[in-house]
């Protein structure tokens, strides 16, 4: 069956969901600043792991918009928060509404974000003191890949985001999503770096505070191809793509939210 048909069939029966194994090692207690011990800070820290308030005008415009929204809302009411780049900001509205609106989710995605940009804006107010969600979902790093970031540096940037969240809200559990596939087929050069980043960040999962999911394979056919029915430009998802993504991570989200 063509992936496009499979996606449409899924849309007709979203309630079924898709299973996806949780990554990581054995559960263990974890202090906030010991998150992601397999990716410790380095000296000097690479650019991808150093907070940087990006200069790109569109990014700054969206950041300013979020500044206003955060100031105008009671962020203590947010039970879930989504953090990341355009793949988060652009979560298809009807799919987002179906899966997350009833959970009090806040979308803090910013198109064009990098790991270092996310770190900077979290430190500058996008994680206010009142924000204590039960779950933070993190998807960031694909722009670092596109602009030549090295897998180990990008993974460290993601780990720094995790450590920041843990330091601000130790009770918040974090679901790291593996970077999604890019390009039409498995020969796309960036896929190798994506695989390397995902292998590194998967090791952050401790199954108690930090969790990992890799929904990317759900978007591909048996030959590793990414249909334009799923990602209209080889990266950004269509409604069908977001349906697959949301259904794919739903079992983990339910499991995490059910934890005491």
Predicted segments — roles?
Residues 181-260:
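Catalytic His-Asp segment of secreted/periplasmic serine-dependent ester chemistry enzymes
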Residues 73-77, 98-100, 128-132, 167-169, ...:
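Extracellular/periplasmic catalytic domains that process cell-envelope and extracellular macromolecules
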Residues 47-56, 107-117, 146, 234:
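Acidic/histidine-rich helix-loop elements
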Residues 55-58, 75-78, 116-152, 237-260:
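N-terminal/domain-start segments enriched in small and hydrophobic, helix-friendly residues
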Residues 82, 113, 117, 149, ...:
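Extracytoplasmic/secreted proteins, especially bacterial periplasmic and envelope-associated proteins
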Residues 89-101, 116-159, 164, 175, ...:
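Oxyanion-hole/transition-state-stabilizing segment in secreted/luminal serine hydrolases
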Residues 79-82, 104-109, 135-140, 144, ...:
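Structural recognition of the beta-strand scaffold that forms the well-ordered cores
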Residues 1-82, 88-94, 98, 255-260:
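N-terminal secretory targeting modules
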């Amino acid at each position: 069956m063509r992936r496009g048909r499979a996606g449409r069939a899924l849309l007709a029966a979203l309630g079924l969901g898709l299973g996806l194994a949780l990554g990581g090692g054995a559960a263990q207690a974890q202090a906030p600043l010991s998150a992601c011990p397999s990716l410790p800070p380095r000296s000097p820290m690479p650019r991808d792991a150093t907070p940087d308030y990006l200069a790109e005008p569109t990014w700054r415009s969206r950041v300013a918009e979020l500044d206003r929204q955060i100031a105008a809302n009671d962020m203590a009411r947010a039970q879930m928060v989504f953090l990341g780049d355009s793949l988060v900001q652009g979560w298809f509205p009807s799919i987002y509404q179906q899966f997350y609106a009833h959970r009090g989710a806040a979308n803090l995605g910013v198109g064009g974000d990098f790991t270092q940009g996310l770190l900077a804006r979290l430190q500058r107010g996008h994680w206010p003191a009142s924000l204590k969600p039960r779950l933070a979902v993190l998807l960031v790093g694909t722009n670092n890949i596109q602009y030549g970031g090295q897998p180990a540096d990008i993974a460290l940037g993601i780990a720094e985001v995790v450590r920041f969240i843990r330091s601000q809200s130790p009770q918040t559990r974090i679901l790291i999503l593996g970077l999604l596939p890019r390009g039409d087929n498995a020969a796309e050069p960036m896929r190798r770096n994506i695989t390397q980043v995902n292998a590194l960040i998967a090791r952050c999962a401790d199954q108690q505070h930090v969790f990992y999911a890799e929904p990317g394979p759900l978007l591909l056919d048996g030959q590793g191809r990414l249909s334009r029915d799923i990602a209209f430009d080889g990266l950004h998802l269509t409604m069908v793509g977001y349906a697959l993504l949301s259904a794919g991570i739903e079992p983990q989200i339910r499991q995490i939210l059910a934890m005491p």
